[in-house]
Each structure stands twice: as C-alpha cells, then as structure tokens.
UniProtKB/Swiss-Prot annotation:
The keyword Nucleus does not apply. Belongs to the UPF0291 family. It comes from the Bacteria. It holds the Pfam family DUF896. GO terms for cellular component: cytoplasm. InterPro entries: DUF896. It is found in: Cytoplasm. Keywords: Cytoplasm. This is UPF0291 protein lp_2062.
Length: 79
C-alpha cells in the first residue's frame, strides 16, 4: 500500500521543483521516491487483477487463461 508520507514527499518535491527548482540531491530523492511509488502501485494493481473474475452476460466465466493460471498457482482456484 502506498503510504501518505511517500505521496506527501513526492508532492512536496514537485511543488518545489515548479517554484524554485531542485538540488541534485533532491532530484535524486525525487527519482527514488517515484520508483518506489511505481513499484508499490504496480504490485497493488497486479494483486487486484489476479483476484479478478470476469463473467459474460450469460453468467459464464470468461476470465483470461493467464489470470486463471496465476490464481491456480497461488491456490485461489480449485478448477
């Protein structure tokens, strides 16, 4: 989960960059924080997709096979 502190610091650096610019140290920190944010975002998104089940109008499950396989590997499916 993405922490409020992480987002607050990213936003703080973004505002400072627009207002007066960043030092090299702050620029490096901003890049590191962005990478951490993206890593956490992708992990959360992947988890949501892996828990997803898709059904058509007739009630038949049409979840993509790749997602089904990941769910089987993690013990989330019985089929």
């Amino acid at each position: 989960m993405i922490s409020k502190e992480l987002l607050a610091r990213i936003n703080e650096l973004a505002h400072k960059a627009k207002a007066e610019g960043l030092t090299e140290l702050e620029e490096a920190e901003r890049q590191e924080l962005r990478q951490k944010y993206l890593k956490e975002f992708r992990a959360g998104f992947r988890q949501q997709v892996e828990m997803l089940q898709v059904y058509d109008k007739d009630g038949k499950e049409v979840t993509p096979e790749k997602v089904r396989q990941v769910q089987r590997d993690r013990g989330l499916r019985d089929d």
